[in-house]
Each structure stands twice: as C-alpha cells, then as structure tokens.
C-alpha cells in the first residue's frame, strides 16, 4: 500500500479505491485514502455489506475534485433516492447499520465454514466473511461447460469470464455466491 502511494505520488497519478466489500472484513488494512487523501477517490456502500436493496453509498475525494465529481454525478444520473439516503443515514446514526453488518458477518462466516467443509481437499480462495468463493476449475473443463453442469445439479455459479477485464490469459474458474440463502 505504501509502495503504491509512493508510485502514485512520484508520477502524479490519482487512485480509485473501491471498498464496497471492505466493511465485511474486520482485519482489513487502513484504506489507501487514509495514506494518500490528496489523490484518492474512495468509495464504499451499504448495498454490498448491509442490504442489497439499500442502494446507497459514499464517495470521498480530494477537495480539488469535488465540483467536477458532483457535475459528473448529475450527468450520469446515478443517484440514491431520497428515501434510501434517509434510511441509510438513520441506520448509521442509530446503530442499525452496525447491527446488520455484524449479523451479515456472522451469517457469511458460517456459510464460508460450510463451503470450506464441502470443498475440503479442493483448492479455492475465499475470505472469512466474504460473500464469494473463487473455485479454479480442472483443466479438462471449460468455464461454460462447468457452469452448465453445475446449474443442472442445482448449483448456481458465475463464470470467471464475467469478471475478467480482458481476454488475456487467466486462471479458469467460477465464482460461487454465498450471499443469497436458498430455501
């Protein structure tokens, strides 16, 4: 993190820090925005970690960019509704957001333990309170074939290609969502 900040300062580069999942990780490092507030656009949201329907988030940025960011925000027309903003602010102020976050962390922690037990002996990546598990797929499968086979067996997974930035060489895999409970 410190090295990234040094490089950004040396080359006068701005940093965009997406911490939408961060609140679910109690031991995460301090945000880069804390190390380099003069060049970091930091955003987080209540949507990912508190409640999906609560489409409300926060953006902090260097003061010099506030006007430009506000103008672009209005142009893109991505705005929280007044009701969602009011609910989000009240929940933060009265402690409801913190209680819901703790509940979510507990529920996801249990689901991650179940996933680890089921996937025992299979290499996978996850975070203790994370909402997703990354599962590399065996070389004999394509992502599409694996996804189709999983769905035929009642398991919904997303192909890694849905999250790739390019078609460059990458590890084939699927993302398993632990955030939605099925009945």
What are the language-model segments listed below?
Residues 41-106:
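Conserved core segment of the aminotransferase class I/II
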Residues 105-116, 124-137, 146-149:
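Conserved glycine-rich beta-strand-loop-beta hairpin in the small C-terminal domain of fold type I
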């Amino acid at each position: 993190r410190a090295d990234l900040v040094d490089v950004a300062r040396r080359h006068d580069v701005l940093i965009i820090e997406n911490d939408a999942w961060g609140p679910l990780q109690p031991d995460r490092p301090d945000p880069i925005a804390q190390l380099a507030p003069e060049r970091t656009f930091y955003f987080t949201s209540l949507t990912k970690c508190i409640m999906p329907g609560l489409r409300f988030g926060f953006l902090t940025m260097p003061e010099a960019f506030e006007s430009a960011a506000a103008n672009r925000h209005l142009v893109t027309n991505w705005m929280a509704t007044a009701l969602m903003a009011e609910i989000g602010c009240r929940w933060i102020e009265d402690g409801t957001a913190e209680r819901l976050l703790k509940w979510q962390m507990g529920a996801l922690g249990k689901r991650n333990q179940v996933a680890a037990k089921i996937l025992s002996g299979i290499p996978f990546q996850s975070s203790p309170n994370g909402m997703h598990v990354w599962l590399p797929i065996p070389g004999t499968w394509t992502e599409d074939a694996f996804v189709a086979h999983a769905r035929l067996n009642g398991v919904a997974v997303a192909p890694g290609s849905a999250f790739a930035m390019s078609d460059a060489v990458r590890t084939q895999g699927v993302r398993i969502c632990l955030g939605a409970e099925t009945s």
